Amino acid sequence: MAVQQNKKSPSKRGMHRSHDFLTATPLAVEPSTGEVHLRHHVSPNGYYRGKKVVKTKND
């Protein structure tokens, strides 16, 4: 099992943890309907990049 040789200072510990924060997922707006969805995913009403690609129950 790995064991550290020297104690890491609070400054170095903070630098190590500086990239561990969570980021918000980027959202996209569907140009034809104005609906918000995850990027590179089909919107809930079946549109992707302005075109109808999936049939929904209402169609």
Curated annotation (Swiss-Prot):
GO MF term set: structural constituent of ribosome
Domain of life: Bacteria
GO CC terms: large ribosomal subunit
GO terms classed as biological process: translation
Basic residues composition bias: residue spans: 49-59
UniProt family annotation: Belongs to the bacterial ribosomal protein bL32 family.
Protein name: Large ribosomal subunit protein bL32
Organism: Burkholderia ambifaria (strain ATCC BAA-244 / DSM 16087 / CCUG 44356 / LMG 19182 / AMMD)
Classification of source organism: Bacteria, Pseudomonadati, Pseudomonadota, Betaproteobacteria, Burkholderiales
